[in-house]
Design a protein with these regions (language model features):
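N-terminal signal peptide c-region/cleavage motif recognized by signal peptidases
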Residues: 24-26
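Bacterial N-terminal signal peptides
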Residues: 14-22
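Mature extracytoplasmic or organellar-lumen-exposed domains after removal of signal/transit peptides
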Residues: 28-215
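Bacterial N-terminal signal peptides that target proteins for export
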Residues: 3-13
Length: 215
């Protein structure tokens, strides 16, 4: 079901109010500490150096995630480069931040894509990917979702937060030495993660979501 809501005010990506949560830990299997994932570090860098109008640094940092831009293009047929390059050449900070936010959304989708492609059979990988998707949302997108909720009287942030909890519960468990293992619920995972995607598209209607994947 498609939901249409009339916003009381236009949503402008509130980079100046971006809340970054610092926490300890490591992303097993990916080799990154929390908050050290390239998507997170480059997004934060774009915000920081954008406010200083350091476009040389912004270009340099975005170049380090060219492979991630290519990844989402190859999977979802969304080429973010033309709009991103336009924003960079025009020194249009708002445009660059919007494209970066779109990249975050597509990277969240990419985590779901690989989990679904593997049928949730690789428990540790599936758990790490989902946690990264949750971090991307919490650190980089949730501030604007909360702002949207405040303007429109919605509760999308709470709903998305709860959906991530539901998604974790669908992964099952390896148990202890195989005892007490719980099988994953792939169909439930697909439904829950699709709901997260749809809610984000309501808040960020300018996001390109790409082609639907047939598994």
């Amino acid at each position: 079901m498609t939901i249409f809501l009339k916003q009381k005010y236009p949503i402008i990506f509130s980079y100046s109010l971006l809340i970054v949560i610092f926490c300890q830990g490591s992303s097993e299997g990916y080799g990154y500490k929390k908050n050290d994932d390239p998507i997170i570090t480059v997004f934060k860098s774009v915000i920081f150096y954008g406010k200083k109008s350091d476009w040389e640094r912004i270009n340099t940092d975005i170049d380090t995630i060219s492979d991630r831009i290519d990844d989402v293009k190859n999977i979802f047929a969304v080429d973010l480069r033309p709009e991103l390059n336009a924003g960079l050449s025009q020194h249009d900070f708002q445009k660059v931040v919007k494209v970066m936010a779109n990249l975050v959304y597509l990277t969240i989708k990419e985590k779901y894509y690989w989990n679904i492609s593997e049928g949730l059979r690789m428990f540790t990988r599936a758990k790490v990917r989902l946690r990264l998707a949750d971090e991307y949302y919490t650190l980089l997108l949730s501030g604007n979702v909360r702002k949207y909720d405040k303007l429109n009287g919605t509760k999308y942030h709470d709903e998305i937060f709860n959906k991530f909890t539901e998604a974790r519960n669908t992964l099952g468990s390896t148990g202890f030495l195989g005892a007490g293992a719980v099988s994953p619920k792939l169909k439930d995972f697909e439904i829950v993660t699709k709901d997260i995607e749809q809610k984000l598209l309501i808040v960020f209607p300018y996001f390109e979501s790409g082609k639907e994947i047939a598994y």
